């Protein structure tokens, strides 16, 4: 991936500054705020803060209907974040979690900081806490060294996940990335053919009313 080369060292604002930006948006009439960034799960590390700290404070603000967390790496999506979202007042039960491949061999080649067992655990944790949650998944096909067997691993892995939608991308070369040194490059024509033929059925996303209205927090059993 070329993003780390382009962005440099991960950095972010602190909780206080982000809260002020949110307050300005709310004062301007915003109904929904999406938390986004190149690596949002890494928020606050330079300030000894965490993404959990931020979303807890944001949830306390008045005047906003809903928040949504954008793409977050599975190794940075903690059980604490999942648990908080499941009981929050304003955070939507919506997660977009990049997978990229359902093959541990390919994930290793991509230098991803997670494997399929962790990814599966995150999906199961979300669905256990929020059965109605909408979960999106990123997938890359045609990564150097990917074989038909690797691709089929991804297909079977996805078939077994309770997710709502897929973003499927065809691998393309980027200058100065380590992937350029990997042999067995998948021909672009083959990668495009695979991309257009991913035979996956996923769980339909929630209907618009439940997806855009403020979340309902389950009441505790007396």
Regions found by a protein language model. Give the residues of each.
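A short acidic, helix-capping loop that chelates divalent metal ions and anchors anionic groups
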Residues: 9-10, 42-44, 104-109, 175-182
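Conserved SAM/AdoMet-binding glycine-rich loop
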Residues: 27-151
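Canonical Radical SAM [4Fe-4S] cluster-binding loop centered on the CxxxCxxC motif
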Residues: 1-16
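Conserved functional loop/turn residues at catalytic and ligand-binding sites
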Residues: 2-5, 29, 76, 138, ...
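S-adenosyl-L-methionine-dependent methyltransferase catalytic core, i.e., the SAM/SAH-binding region
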Residues: 21
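Auxiliary Fe-S-binding modules of radical SAM enzymes
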Residues: 127-134, 156-199, 222
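N-terminal low-complexity segments that are often proline-rich with Ser/Thr-Pro
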Residues: 195-222
């Amino acid at each position: 991936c070329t993003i780390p080369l382009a962005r440099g060292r991960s950095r972010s604002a602190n909780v206080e500054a982000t809260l002020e930006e949110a307050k300005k948006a709310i004062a301007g009439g915003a109904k929904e705020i999406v938390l986004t960034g190149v690596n949002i799960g890494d928020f606050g590390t330079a300030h000894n803060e965490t993404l959990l700290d931020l979303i807890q404070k944001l949830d306390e603000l008045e005047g906003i209907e809903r928040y949504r967390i954008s793409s977050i790496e599975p190794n940075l999506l903690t059980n604490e974040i999942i648990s908080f979202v499941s009981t929050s007042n304003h955070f939507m039960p919506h997660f977009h979690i990049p997978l990229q491949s359902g093959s541990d061999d390919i994930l290793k080649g991509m230098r991803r900081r997670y494997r399929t067992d962790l990814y599966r655990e995150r999906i199961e944790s979300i669905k256990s806490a929020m059965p109605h949650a909408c979960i999106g998944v990123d997938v890359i096909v045609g990564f150097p060294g990917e074989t038909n067997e690797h691709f089929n691993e991804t297909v079977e892995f996805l078939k077994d996940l309770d997710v709502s939608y897929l973003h499927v991308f065809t691998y393309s070369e980027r200058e100065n990335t380590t992937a350029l040194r990997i042999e067995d490059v998948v021909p672009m024509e083959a990668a495009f053919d695979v991309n257009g033929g991913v035979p996956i059925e996923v769980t339909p996303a929630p209907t618009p009313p439940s997806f855009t209205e403020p979340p309902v927090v389950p009441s505790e059993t007396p």
